[in-house]
Amino acid sequence: MISASSSKYDMIMKASVSLFTERGFDATTIPMIAERAHVGTGTIYRYFDSKETLVNVLFQESIQRFTEKLKQDVSELPVREGFHHVFCCLVQFTKESDYALFFLETKKDAHYLNHTSKKMIENLTQMLDDYFNKGKAEGVIRSLPSNVLIAIVLGAFLKIYQLVQTGDIEMDTDLITELEQCCWDAIKLHSSQK
């Protein structure tokens, strides 16, 4: 059985990530979070001393969950297999939390992130950078900067996922497979480019 305090914490976190994603950090207030989470404002302050603390805990938990999904160093896998692994992790992560991936992407350079949050995203970005550098060195991935390659893949994935959230398309196995292949085709070095 889930304790009431654990349940309240979870409700606060879910309400926070959705509001921060929808409205942004500055336009979201603690009373709005409390209303959406169906808890009192004071309850939020029992867990977090400020909105900045709340957003950093949320950010760090999201980064940690995604990093745990990756589990292994993708730079040690064959390049195409590493891409498949990262892509599957993106799919799993968004299925578990509709807003978490959007939150991580839109807030990664935010002024209110503390040192720990910035360090965690830096570590994740470095892991992906190592993977892309390996692929570029092996002549498998285009020689674009890693942040551009990440933007190509993540941008396409996030836009498709927005269409899923609005009900415009259904995310099924065939779509996931085709989307992965499209993203891979966008970043791989084609034989005519060598």
From Swiss-Prot:
One Pfam family matching this protein: TetR_N
Keyword 4Fe-4S set for record: no
Highest taxon above the source species: Bacteria
UniProt keyword DNA-binding, yes or no: yes
DNA-binding region per UniProt: 29-48
Keywords, alphabetical: DNA-binding, Repressor, Transcription, Transcription regulation
Protein name: HTH-type transcriptional repressor FatR
Native source organism of the sequence: Bacillus subtilis (strain 168)
Source taxonomy: Bacteria, Bacillati, Bacillota, Bacilli, Bacillales
